């Protein structure tokens, strides 16, 4: 195993490693602390033995378990008010197209399966190197609007995650079949299973059964019951039919309060905003200022995030005002939260070229590509924006597109507006609450 602590983009040109080599970028103490709590080599008995185990149960024996007082509240879904993390476990909080994310204590741990046949381990470090590079080079408070990983482990064997998923899936299948008095089988229909699981997951009786069987059958400190349907969609998607869940990266992040898309009117007001639309203006303005300051840096006018959307913006506590200077103006944020850009997996900047997007983009793009996509996703996430005529009309300037040049909100053609377009946009009265401190 190698260790590299330099946060400069030179990571991109480190010598290639053997297939079995692992490397740690960033803080080794954070990383090793997390790894010490994971069993990457846990194995389970063959599934046929699990099937035979469940033959010892029927509806009557399950009913007796349901009548017990014991319940592990960590097996409720996290959005359920009854959920409580009673153990120091890894709790599944999200699975997207490219990563499986867990929470433990005040950390977020992201596992990313990488296509090792397409990229060397050092070609998959953008999620660590790009934000670290930007943070080290930005000079003002704008650097506070970036989420930097504390550590990243490259080229780790991650087969245990897929094995764990299959074990939990088989347990749920057999448990549901036993509850319904059906013949036990490990064959399943995706549609039928998801319907049965979603119907039961919020039931206190079902959670009591999970409280009994998860420790007995799974015996792991990784709890994947929360949002299990997302993990199901990830592993069962047809595009991953022949996927090798072999190696990938492990990334350690600070724990955020929320992702930006989780804020509704009630929460926006609780956070101190006058309305949901004012909150949306807040995150838009902070992201715009971040991009403008990045584009001021030497050789950074090629910066692309490539996935700028509300769920890739995280909210953190802000204990002091954030002040960002631009020309003769200063933008003052006295809110008790700040927004910060996250998930740089497909990003590029300066000389850090990301092969994951280089091969996908057929034409040249700049900041406008990101904000075109950002505005589309904002309008989709928050239809309330339309109630503010001035703001919604202004945002439409970013999405003057047609089906021929825009596909699923992403530009297919090269539109290279200068960054001055964005600078002028944020000087409007729309953002007067923050310009010069609202004076």
UniProtKB/Swiss-Prot annotation:
It comes from the Viruses. Its EC number is 2.7.11.1. One of its GO terms (cellular component) is host cell endoplasmic reticulum-Golgi intermediate compartment. Keywords: ATP-binding, Host endoplasmic reticulum, Kinase, Late protein, Nucleotide-binding, Phosphoprotein, Serine/threonine-protein kinase, Transferase. It comes from Vaccinia virus (strain Copenhagen) (VACV). InterPro entries: Poxvirus_ser/thr_kinase, Prot_kinase_dom, Ser/Thr_kinase_AS. Essential serine-protein kinase involved in the early stage of virion morphogenesis. The active site is at 307 (proton acceptor). Pfam families: Pox_ser-thr_kin. Coiled coil: none annotated. It catalyses: L-seryl-[protein] + ATP = O-phospho-L-seryl-[protein] + ADP + H(+); L-threonyl-[protein] + ATP = O-phospho-L-threonyl-[protein] + ADP + H(+). Residues 87-439 form the Protein kinase domain. Phosphorylated in vivo. Autophosphorylated in vitro. Its main location: host cell. One of its GO terms (molecular function) is protein serine kinase activity. It is found in: Host endoplasmic reticulum; Host endoplasmic reticulum-Golgi intermediate compartment. ATP binds at residues 93-101, 117. This is Serine/threonine-protein kinase 2. Belongs to the protein kinase superfamily. Ser/Thr protein kinase family. Poxviruses subfamily.
